[in-house]
Amino acid sequence: VVSPKQQYQEYVFQRIEDYKNSLARDELLRLGNDAALEIQDATEGQYFLTEVVMQETVDDIIRKRLRLPSFKRWREKHAKVRQAQKSPTHWGLERNSAVAAILPRLEAGDRALVVGGGAEAAAYLLAAHDVHLTCLFGDDRTCTRIETRMAAESLTGNFEAFVAMLGSWFPSLDQPVHLVVIDAGTLATLPSPRRVSLMARLQDATVPGGIHAVMPGGGGAAEAWVSLYPDWERIPVPARSTRTRGKRESSPGVLMSRPFPPATSHASTA
């Protein structure tokens, strides 16, 4: 699990990089000149300017401009923010959604895979629960948007994302995953051969007893894909505790559990 200090360092790094990326070339050059002058003033001209010294000075200038908090101040605020981030409703998810229902089964350090931009909210929620999160998206824009939001929310500690032609390429995973969240809308857009290939890879990458949560999104119905799990067990999703008058019930999604392999029988020699 990533320590608070590492999370803080990642937060500062990402804020600084985002600031640099927002500057035009002439502004970057002026920033470099400011850094060189600051180094010269601080050392009364007796210095050996290296790339490392320049980079550190530039980062310090940006940190002051952005008024980034100290680690102590950030940690105090971060604890309150992280508590809010762990709530499904913080990300616009219903408390009875399939992903919310599976949260009690997860532990920090578990591995999860999220597929499709329509499952964006689930990605943030899982990252807030300190799982090792891998995301697969079909386009650069979605990936960039989610990476940027992850960084802004200080959720990048155990997060990585890939852009791929879904169903044609699959990342090499160090270990199988405990949870896969799939955007039904993304599945609906794939040609059948690629959809079947993607689902086969996702199922193979899941530990026995692991869970797939198929979430409605982008006009795709989760129920439409239950047939892709012929040997898996369907897990009931808790019903909504209260109903809103006049409001149409939204689908919570579908939960499927990978079966355990049959126990190997050993002949008795007694």
Question: In which residue ranges do the predicted regions lie?
Answer:
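Conserved beta-strand signature within the Rossmann-like core of class I S-adenosyl-L-methionine
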Residues: P208-G218
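Conserved SAM-binding loop of SAM-dependent methyltransferases across substrates and taxa
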Residues: A119-V131
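Conserved class I S-adenosyl-L-methionine
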Residues: A108-G118
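A short acidic, Gly/Pro-enriched loop at the edge of an enzyme's catalytic core
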Residues: W169-V180
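Conserved alpha-helix/loop element of class I SAM-dependent methyltransferases that forms part
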Residues: H90-G109
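Class I S-adenosyl-L-methionine
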Residues: G220-A270
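N-terminal accessory regions of S-adenosyl-L-methionine
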Residues: V1-H90, H266-A270
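A short glycine-rich, Lys/Arg-flanked "PGG" loop and its adjoining helix->strand segment in the class I
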Residues: R194-P208
